Structures are given as C-alpha cells and as structure tokens.
Design a protein with these regions (language model features):
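Active-site neighborhoods and metal-handling regions in enzymes and metal-associated proteins
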Residues: 1-242
Length: 242
C-alpha cells in the first residue's frame, strides 16, 4: 500500500473483478462439517478457548481474528471437506474475552453441532460477515491478527481507532504441540495406513506383468485398500505412485 501511494496508486481489496465476467462461477463449497470428540482431540473446545484468551490477555488484545482454516478447525474441534486433501471448512473465527464467533455457512453444521457450539459460547454467523464484524470492532479497542495470514480486506476493515497487534496466532503453537491423545491417534492412523500400503505392495508383486496397470490405476487400488480400513476419511495428499 505504501509503495502504491508513492506512485499515486491505490490497492482496492473489496472488489472481485472475476464476478463481473464469470457468469456461471460455481458457489463456494458447502460440504457438511463434522465434530471431533475429546476422545480424539484430547482437549475440549472450552479448554482451547481458555488458553487462547490467556494469551490474548497477556498481549493486551481485546479481540482475536483468525483466518487460517486449520487454526479455526483446531480451535473449534471441527473438520470439513471444502479443500482437497485437507479436512477443513471455509471459515473465519473471532474470539473475545467473553464470547467467540464462527463465521461459516450455517448449512454445513448439523443441529447437534450448532447446539454444542452454543453451549460453549460460540455464535455462528455467515461466512462473509467477518468483514462487517471487523468494521464494527469497538472504538479504541485492540485486535490481534497475524498480518501474514489474514487477507488484506480484513486488515482494511479495521477501524482507524482500533489498535492492531500483528502477532502469530495464539492457536499456532498449541496446535503444533500434540497431546498424548493426538500422538496415539497418529500412531493408530499410521498403522492402518501401513496395512493399506503393505496390501498394495503385495498386490503389485503378484500382479505386475499379468494385468494392465499404470500410475492412475495403482493409485486407485491404493485408495481402495485405504477405504477398507476403519475410520478412513480421505488422502492427505495425491499419491506419488512413481
């Protein structure tokens, strides 16, 4: 922005030029989200919110705005299917000392999930309302956001009277440090995936040269073996068969 101003230019963040020419643009993904129980996460949503608020308090922040999909899902103990190979939902979140807001398409949340969120003090608002929320931050308050992560429009929506703390999201490090329950989940997942990969290797050794196969068909076979394992959801990346 400063560079543009020196050249008598201006960066506009609130206009999507593609909307003006893409008449049949697909709607945003709206796959159903699901909730992870504490038996898998090791920590409840309330525990995570409490830890985040302690960090906010230590830095003098009144509000936290989160835009990292993985951090939002970690904080809310929710998962989605809006991005290939990554179980996240299109969302934003805001946290204050007294409440929290999840900006998401309400249609992807079951009645049960919505009730659980309400019990934990989380309000649900439409996905795009994060911008209006940011515009209405209390005067002379302080908001924390990671300017390397939030989009430029969110930053532009912050009122001039609101102080911005540019800081690593307080969810980032706790998300990275796995608790005992999560570590055990990793171990079990690797065992199940190892069974699927071992079955693929056995299948390859007994069928190579006997039936037609290429990288695509082998990838499909691996996916077939993985789908047969308990609790399988989907691949974490496209298989590198070669």
């Amino acid at each position: 922005q400063r560079i543009a101003e020196k050249k008598q230019g201006k960066i506009v963040s609130d206009v999507d030029l593609l909307d003006e020419i893409w008449a049949e643009r697909p709607a945003l993904s709206a796959e159903p989200a699901w909730e992870l129980p504490v038996s898998l996460t090791g920590r409840s949503r309330q525990e995570k919110l409490h830890q985040v608020r302690r960090e906010m308090e230590s830095l003098g922040a009144d509000t936290l705005v989160l835009s990292s999909l993985m951090d939002v899902c970690w904080l809310m103990n929710l998962r989605g299917n809006d991005v290939d190979c990554t179980p996240v939902m299109l969302s934003f979140a805001a946290v204050t000392m007294t409440d929290a807001v999840l900006f998401v398409n309400p249609a992807i949340l079951s009645t049960e999930i919505q009730a659980h969120l309400k019990e934990d003090g989380v309000t649900i608002r439409p996905y795009a309302c994060v911008y209006e929320y940011t515009k209405k931050l209390p005067e002379d308050s302080t908001v924390m956001m990671n300017l390397n992560v939030v989009n430029s429009l969110i930053r532009a929506c912050v009122p001039a009277s609101v102080r911005v703390i540019d800081h690593v999201d307080p969810t980032e490090l706790p998300k990275a440090v796995k608790n005992a329950t999560e570590v055990e989940g990793f171990r079990k997942a690797h065992v199940q995936d190892g069974v699927a990969v071992t079955r693929l290797m056995y299948w390859l050794k007994h069928n190579v040269g006997k039936i037609p196969m290429d990288e695509l068909s082998v990838a499909e076979k691996l996916e077939e073996f993985r789908r047969e394992r308990p609790d399988y959801i989907g691949p974490s990346f496209a298989p590198i068969i070669a």
